[in-house]
Amino acid sequence: NKNLTFAHKSKIKVNMFSGIVEEAAKVISVEQDKGNIHITMECSFVNELKIDQSVAHNGVCLTVVSKTDKTYTVTAIKETLERSNLGCLKQGSMVNLERSMLMNGRLDGHIVQGHVDQTAVCTDVTEADGSWYYTFHYNFNKEMAQQGYLTVEKGSVCVNGVSLTVCNSKDDSFQVAIIPYTHDHTNFCQIEKGTVVNLEFDIVGKYISKMMRFQ
């Protein structure tokens, strides 16, 4: 198995992504099951998927639990729904998909775990010279800063599963620039003012922030 998946005797898996979206795919159905939801997706690489395989959905690592020739299904639990925007999905929604990295592949984005930290709200979209500039605001306080839930100028951040470079970094907001290819091949083409997105902050920054607490 060439997937960058490490299995222990307890069958606990650790997956890694790069924030390079393979496809913006369509939600076929969303089924409520107590506190969980079952999301059925249609995508071009469904025949390559296997049961128990991990796929990032808007940056959230989910496990394939069933599949057909044309669709596959994943389950999002209550904690995931509370922390991400997956609870907003409905039939026809477009979702950014990325399978876990291959050990012999390039790391074209940055290290992404598929563990969303929190959501943010788009507060501005500006088109300029063929590119788009998106501004996002998120909840921020001292405790979050100590956990590494912050951005730095020219650092990396994962927005809806897309690896991006930060500009105009502030305590509770940041901006990213989107090129036409990314705009057209991810669900950034549907993001507008008021849209809720998923954030995963840089894992390197999280570890540095934690180590600084012991200085």
What are these regions (language model features)?
Residues 1-15:
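Short, Lys/Arg-enriched N-terminal segments with co-localized hydrophobic residues
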Residues 15-215:
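Conserved loop->alpha-helix
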